[in-house]
Regions:
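N-terminal Rossmann-like FAD-binding beta1-loop-alpha1 element of flavoenzymes
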Residues: 1-24
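Short N-terminal binding/cap micro-motifs at the start of the first secondary-structure element
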Residues: 8-10, 31-34
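Conserved beta-strand segments of alpha/beta enzyme cores
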Residues: 21, 85, 115-117
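Glycine-rich active-site loop/strand segments that organize a redox cofactor
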Residues: 40-90
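Mobile, glycine/GP-rich and aromatic-enriched active-site lid/loop segments adjacent to catalytic centers
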Residues: 81-106
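A conserved short coil-to-beta-strand element within the FAD-binding core of flavoproteins
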Residues: 120-123
Length: 123
Protein backbone atom coordinates (compact mmCIF):
# COMPACT_ATOMS: atom_id res chain seq x y z
CA UNK A 1 0.00 0.00 0.00
CA UNK A 2 1.32 3.45 -0.84
CA UNK A 3 0.64 6.35 1.52
CA UNK A 4 0.24 6.34 5.30
CA UNK A 5 -2.54 8.91 5.44
CA UNK A 6 -6.03 8.27 6.77
CA UNK A 7 -7.20 6.13 3.84
CA UNK A 8 -3.92 4.25 3.48
CA UNK A 9 -3.66 3.35 7.16
CA UNK A 10 -7.35 2.40 7.39
CA UNK A 11 -7.08 0.17 4.32
CA UNK A 12 -3.79 -1.36 5.48
CA UNK A 13 -5.17 -2.06 8.96
CA UNK A 14 -8.32 -3.66 7.56
CA UNK A 15 -6.39 -5.84 5.11
CA UNK A 16 -3.89 -6.87 7.78
CA UNK A 17 -6.62 -7.73 10.26
CA UNK A 18 -8.23 -9.89 7.56
CA UNK A 19 -5.06 -11.94 7.29
CA UNK A 20 -3.44 -10.21 4.33
CA UNK A 21 0.27 -9.50 4.29
CA UNK A 22 0.62 -5.72 4.00
CA UNK A 23 3.56 -3.40 3.44
CA UNK A 24 2.69 0.27 3.94
CA UNK A 25 5.06 2.71 2.25
CA UNK A 26 5.22 6.39 3.21
CA UNK A 27 7.64 8.92 1.71
CA UNK A 28 7.36 11.41 4.56
CA UNK A 29 9.16 10.94 7.88
CA UNK A 30 5.85 11.08 9.81
CA UNK A 31 2.68 9.13 9.13
CA UNK A 32 -0.72 10.81 9.09
CA UNK A 33 0.64 14.31 8.56
CA UNK A 34 -2.56 15.66 6.98
CA UNK A 35 -4.55 14.15 9.86
CA UNK A 36 -2.24 15.89 12.32
CA UNK A 37 -2.84 19.34 10.84
CA UNK A 38 -6.54 18.95 9.99
CA UNK A 39 -9.12 20.88 11.93
CA UNK A 40 -6.52 23.19 13.39
CA UNK A 41 -4.81 20.26 15.07
CA UNK A 42 -8.06 18.81 16.42
CA UNK A 43 -8.87 16.60 13.41
CA UNK A 44 -12.30 16.76 11.82
CA UNK A 45 -12.26 12.97 11.69
CA UNK A 46 -15.70 12.33 10.20
CA UNK A 47 -19.03 13.86 9.31
CA UNK A 48 -22.08 11.87 10.36
CA UNK A 49 -24.21 13.70 7.80
CA UNK A 50 -22.08 12.64 4.85
CA UNK A 51 -23.87 10.27 2.54
CA UNK A 52 -23.48 9.16 -1.07
CA UNK A 53 -25.00 12.43 -2.33
CA UNK A 54 -22.13 14.34 -0.67
CA UNK A 55 -19.58 12.91 -3.10
CA UNK A 56 -18.97 13.53 -6.80
CA UNK A 57 -18.32 10.43 -8.85
CA UNK A 58 -18.66 9.07 -12.34
CA UNK A 59 -20.14 5.99 -10.66
CA UNK A 60 -22.63 6.92 -7.91
CA UNK A 61 -23.20 3.23 -7.10
CA UNK A 62 -19.57 2.94 -5.96
CA UNK A 63 -19.99 5.52 -3.20
CA UNK A 64 -23.31 4.05 -2.09
CA UNK A 65 -21.72 0.61 -1.90
CA UNK A 66 -18.57 1.81 -0.11
CA UNK A 67 -20.49 3.77 2.54
CA UNK A 68 -22.85 0.85 3.10
CA UNK A 69 -19.80 -1.28 3.95
CA UNK A 70 -17.95 1.30 6.10
CA UNK A 71 -19.42 4.66 6.93
CA UNK A 72 -18.98 7.50 9.41
CA UNK A 73 -20.69 5.56 12.21
CA UNK A 74 -18.22 2.69 11.78
CA UNK A 75 -15.26 5.05 12.11
CA UNK A 76 -16.88 6.70 15.14
CA UNK A 77 -17.22 3.27 16.78
CA UNK A 78 -13.48 2.72 16.22
CA UNK A 79 -12.68 6.13 17.75
CA UNK A 80 -14.80 5.27 20.79
CA UNK A 81 -13.19 1.81 21.18
CA UNK A 82 -9.86 3.62 21.44
CA UNK A 83 -11.24 5.97 24.10
CA UNK A 84 -10.73 9.14 22.07
CA UNK A 85 -12.91 11.94 23.38
CA UNK A 86 -14.67 14.00 20.73
CA UNK A 87 -17.31 16.64 20.19
CA UNK A 88 -19.68 17.70 17.42
CA UNK A 89 -18.93 21.16 16.14
CA UNK A 90 -21.80 21.68 13.71
CA UNK A 91 -23.92 19.65 11.31
CA UNK A 92 -22.34 16.30 12.17
CA UNK A 93 -18.71 17.47 12.01
CA UNK A 94 -16.84 15.47 14.66
CA UNK A 95 -13.55 16.69 16.14
CA UNK A 96 -11.12 15.34 18.74
CA UNK A 97 -11.45 17.11 22.09
CA UNK A 98 -7.69 17.22 22.51
CA UNK A 99 -5.34 16.51 19.62
CA UNK A 100 -5.44 14.97 16.17
CA UNK A 101 -2.45 12.85 17.20
CA UNK A 102 -4.92 10.55 18.99
CA UNK A 103 -6.40 9.59 15.61
CA UNK A 104 -2.93 9.06 14.10
CA UNK A 105 -1.96 6.83 17.05
CA UNK A 106 -5.26 4.94 16.77
CA UNK A 107 -4.70 4.18 13.08
CA UNK A 108 -1.09 3.20 13.77
CA UNK A 109 -2.27 0.84 16.55
CA UNK A 110 -4.86 -0.70 14.22
CA UNK A 111 -2.14 -1.27 11.61
CA UNK A 112 0.12 -2.84 14.24
CA UNK A 113 -2.77 -5.08 15.35
CA UNK A 114 -3.04 -6.24 11.73
CA UNK A 115 0.68 -6.97 11.48
CA UNK A 116 1.27 -4.25 8.88
CA UNK A 117 4.92 -3.75 7.93
CA UNK A 118 6.15 -0.14 7.55
CA UNK A 119 8.67 1.47 5.23
CA UNK A 120 9.29 5.14 5.89
CA UNK A 121 10.60 7.46 4.85
CA UNK A 122 10.68 5.87 1.45
CA UNK A 123 12.36 7.91 -1.31
Amino acid sequence: MIGAGAAGMTCAATAGQRGRRVLLIEHYHRVGEKIRISGGGRCNFTNTGAGPASYLSQNPDFCRSALARYGPRDFLALVERHGIRWHEKKLGQLFCDETSLHVVRMLRAECDRGGVEWRQPCP
